[in-house]
């Protein structure tokens, strides 16, 4: 989801949104994190949530996923983001059949791989990712799709020998960064603050 389906990171967006709404309660973030990253994500999702309607979606990937769904593929949104946020995004995009997200434990890297293998078996699923954390998930995927890869990740994905689609960032880096940061939203927020 983060950096793949959307051009931003929901945890970072949630932290900024929390700090904007509750600047004097910044210290809570540290206490929440002391109980683990899953707890931090849960508490942020309970307190603030970025709007699924205004997130900077990867339009090329969304279009491809829509095509896959029409062709009969079962689409599962598996993310390390909090399940509440993932559910909101799945509802907004209306392309996913199932949603897996962080609840009691952070559904990242090896934990995500374990969840997918338990549901679909070894080499029983295709997976779209973008970061080194996705390498663990790709090791058990039948096809490795890559979207907006972090530096060095594409070569490591190719090394697995099962690369499918590669979605590159559409546009120049400054334009992508501006879209991911959603500066126009923060400008409006500053005017309201």
Which positions does each model-derived feature cover?
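Cytosolic catalytic headpiece of P-type ATPases
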Residues: 7-13, 38-50, 57-60, 83-86, ...
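C-terminal cap/substrate-recognition subdomain and adjoining C-terminal extension
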Residues: 52-193
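Active-site neighborhood of HAD-like aspartate-dependent phosphohydrolases
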Residues: 1-45
């Amino acid at each position: 989801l983060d950096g793949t389906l959307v051009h931003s990171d929901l945890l970072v967006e949630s932290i900024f949104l929390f700090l904007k709404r509750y600047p004097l309660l910044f210290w809570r973030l540290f206490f929440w994190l002391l109980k683990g990253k899953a707890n931090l994500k849960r508490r942020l999702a309970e307190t603030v949530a970025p709007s699924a309607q205004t997130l900077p979606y990867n339009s090329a990937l969304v279009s491809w996923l829509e095509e896959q769904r029409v062709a009969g593929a079962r689409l599962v949104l598996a993310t390390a983001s909090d399940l509440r946020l993932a559910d909101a995004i799945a509802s907004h995009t209306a392309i996913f059949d199932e949603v897996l997200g962080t609840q009691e434990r952070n559904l990242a890297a090896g934990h995500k791989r374990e969840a997918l293998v338990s549901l679909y078996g070894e080499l029983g699923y295709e997976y779209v990712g973008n970061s080194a954390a996705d390498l663990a998930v790709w090791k058990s995927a039948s096809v490795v799709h890559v979207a907006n890869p972090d530096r060095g990740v594409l070569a490591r994905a190719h090394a697995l020998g099962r690369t499918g689609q590669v979605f590159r960032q559409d546009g120049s880096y400054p334009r992508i960064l501006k879209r991911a940061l959603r500066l126009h939203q923060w400008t409006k927020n500053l005017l309201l603050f």
